[in-house]
Amino acid sequence: MNEKLTKNQRREQAREQARLAREAEKKREKRNRLFLQGGIALVIIAVLGVVALVLTQSMKPAGPGPLNMISGGVTFSKDLEVVKTKALQDGDARKAPEQDWTKTPVDVTVYVDYMCPACGTFEQQNGDMLEQYVGSGDVNLTVFPLNFLDGQSLGTKYSTRAANAFSCLVEQQPENAFAYHNRLLSKEVQPAEQTTGLTDDQLVENAVAAGAKDTTEFKQCVKDQRFAPFINANWKSASETGLLGLAEGAQLINDPRVGDLQPADEPQRLRSTPTVIVNGVQWVDGRDGSLEEYILKIKGELDGSADKKKEDTAEAAG
């Protein structure tokens, strides 16, 4: 039989029970704080994860190809503005620019390799003229960068790196792409064959000299050769599948040294650079006169047709 507790013992027992209750409450509060902190931490981690994903996605290229080059090339129109296009997605075929050869502007497409000496000579002879006519809206110029001379840069793949840098700028800072294209082919900048070509840093420096900003995104795009696969596919498309946007029945030169034409019933493949297409037909230096004369002849014919159409319309209305 338990002895009856004294008053002091009952007091001590009550104190002990109160102490145990306080400790239990403290442990419960601590446990709740840990749960709360853990929950907040999980929320923070989740938010950071979303932010990181958004940032990562924003830094990725819009597709395997750059923006504004869905044909494989970039088209410059009036005031040297780039014609906007979506990026070429993986598995998609290149799409020729929309063309209407019944009226101006005249369409000029140039296939170039930035290490090609003849491309440099072509640009030095015709660059200012094309800039004038594109700026005025008389010509739309499409530049199609290639890399078939990679083997001429002592292992650095300069043609790919230069074409990639150009493509990076077309996507990120298109307002400076025309000047950059001209600069890469200028006598002061274009490297000779059998040299290593410009370094990646020098490619960025020359973009800045052409008016671009040396943003982290641009420099990373150049360094990573983000669009190298796109440039590789450009060469494969032009040299194997055949050129896009040719006029019906148009034939390209087969051997530039001879001047013979490719078979009409086969895809018209690129044989050399620069290859220049004007309103769907190849312009050949030495056969067709100067490029400016050739463009003005076509422009004159189109303007004459337009004027006659206006006269006929006016007579019919009268």
Task: Enumerate the predicted regions with their spans.
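Structural alpha/beta surface segment adjacent to cysteine/selenocysteine redox centers
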Residues: 120-208
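Proline-centered helix-kink/hinge sites
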Residues: 117, 128, 273-274
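Residue-level marker of regulatory loop/turn positions in helix-turn-helix DNA-binding domains and
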Residues: 27, 100, 157-158
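Short active-site neighborhood of thiol/selenol oxidoreductases, capturing the structured segment around
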Residues: 102-117, 123, 140-141, 145
